[in-house]
Amino acid sequence: SKMASGVRRLPTPAERREIEDLVREEFIRQGVSASAVEKLKYHNLTAIDVNADGQAEMVGTFWAENSANERNLLFFIAEKNKSGKYAFDYSEYRKVTPDQVMSGDFTEVDKGVYHELLLDSLEYDGDQTAEIFTLVRGFEGNNFNVYSKRNGRWTRIFERSNYHCAY
């Protein structure tokens, strides 16, 4: 039986350019300024072949600094569509402002707090496609998510938090 390949690698330069174009388009669609989008930043972009089909899915965490008081976060799972181009199959955009930062230190967002980050991929439910495991760091704990390919779409199937009072 065919199993998830476990391939995990850096994207090629061509893959990175294609993904960055998608990310820029999404940020512009969300109202982020063109100048902020030009200075695109990221925490992670990983190529993972989740189903051993020879086509890498891309899991990424990008952000932009729209202003001194606004960060724009984007987590996504992208895969090639029928025309051979990458498209977001799952994406979540979030705008963060200083009033949402519990510590009062807005630079914590730039260091990864509130960003959804890839932990790993693992095939665990027998469907021959690896699930994607992520972490969202917070000030009073972390959120853990699992994504699975369901009915042809990436879907969050698990969400849990560990909580400890920090303030």
Stretch-by-stretch model annotation:
Residues S1-Y167:
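Beta-propeller-forming repeat regions
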